[in-house]
A protein has these predicted regions:
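Glycine-rich acetyl-CoA-binding "A-motif" of GNAT/NAT acetyltransferases
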Residues: 56-59, 116, 196-200, 257
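Conserved beta-strand-loop-alpha-helix junction that forms the acyl-donor binding cleft
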Residues: 107-117, 220, 249-259, 275-283
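Conserved GNAT acetyl-CoA-binding A-motif
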Residues: 96-112, 120, 239-250
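Conserved acetyl-CoA-binding loop of GNAT-fold acetyltransferases
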Residues: 122-130, 263-272
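Conserved donor-binding loop and adjoining core beta-sheet/short helix segment
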Residues: 8, 21-24, 28-101, 110, ...
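Phosphate-binding active sites in nucleotide-utilizing proteins
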Residues: 176, 183-194, 198-207
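Conserved acetyl-CoA-binding loop-helix of GNAT-fold acetyltransferases
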Residues: 83-96, 123, 215-218, 224-241, ...
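Short amphipathic alpha-helix that is part of the acyltransferase structural core
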Residues: 1-37, 145-174
Length: 284
């Protein structure tokens, strides 16, 4: 039975965690479920689709909004319940929700090794937009020098313009929902300063013994000076000191310089995910 959920109850979150465990145990890798987002759903609109068989959760598809231009769709189906059309039913139920919210397109996130997931995306007319490696650090970061001229401080809402400029310089676009991120108690956005000059930014999340690194950017004019490696080591040491035992991040597969930086600090690739673009206006 399909449930269109407005917010996720404690029971649903526990069922999601168990379903995630089953899928990762069977398939390896990881799932991009963004637990902090799932636990903070507002309940004002349908953002999650759950497929139940009695009290057992067999399938899930979540909608994740990143700005006004795109939604990401991430889902999973229990290994024992595959080839029953559950994934197709979940995606077919999700697309009208995307259209109702006036998004021009959605990105369906598919594990690179999932032939069935790729086929489902292509059957809906999706095209491969890009791919990303998911990396994890399970041990101490590599050792290295710490530049005394480089400092870190927590960004606040008043820093929004500075953080936006740094993200635009590095990535070509700002982070969606930046002001809310800067005001959040559940995640930290840090400013990287060199002799008092803002030269970079990085966002950290924590959930239990797992942590995530996002939006890591160094001003192109300051790259090549070891600042990125220095900062990444510092924040990984900080997160581990706070109890994190698993630190994750993502990088585009064609960003070889960033991948080299992350692996030099000790991160390893756990999976590669393909992002398939669905043009929603063409899916009537």
């Amino acid at each position: 039975m399909l449930e269109r959920a407005r917010g996720l109850s404690p029971h649903a979150l526990r069922a999601l965690a168990e379903l995630e465990r089953q899928v990762v145990e069977a398939d390896g890798g990881r799932l991009k479920l963004e637990w902090g987002t799932l636990e903070a759903r507002s309940g004002s609109q349908v953002e999650d689709l759950l497929w139940w068989q009695g009290e057992q959760l067999l399938g899930f598809l979540g909608l994740y909004a990143f700005g006004a231009s795109c939604l990401e769709l991430v889902g999973m189906v229990a290994p024992a319940a595959r080839r029953r059309g559950i994934a197709t039913a979940l995606l077919d139920a999700a697309l009208p929700l995307c259209r109702q919210r006036n998004y021009p397109r959605a990105l369906l996130v598919v594990p690179g090794a999932s032939v069935a997931g790729s086929r489902l995306a292509q059957d809906r007319g999706a095209t491969l937009d890009h791919s990303e490696h998911a990396l994890v650090l399970l041990d101490r970061p590599s050792s290295g020098p710490e530049d005394p001229q480089v400092g870190l401080r927590r960004a606040v809402p008043a820093d929004a313009a500075v953080v936006t400029a740094l993200l635009e310089a590095a990535f070509g676009h700002p982070a969606p929902g930046l002001y809310e991120q800067l005001a959040s108690e559940n995640e930290r956005t840090l400013l990287v300063e060199a002799a008092g000059t803002p030269v970079g930014t990085i966002r950290l999340t924590r959930r239990g013994d797992a942590a995530g690194v996002y939006g890591f950017a160094v001003d192109p004019d300051w790259q090549g000076r070891g600042i990125g490696r220095d900062v990444l080591r510092r924040v990984c040491h900080q997160l581990r000191g706070e109890g994190a035992r698993r630190i994750g991040l993502e990088v585009a597969v064609d960003n070889e310089s960033a991948l080299g930086l992350y692996t030099s600090v000790g991160f390893t690739i756990v999976t590669t995910e393909d992002y398939y673009a669905l043009t929603l206006g063409a899916l009537e």
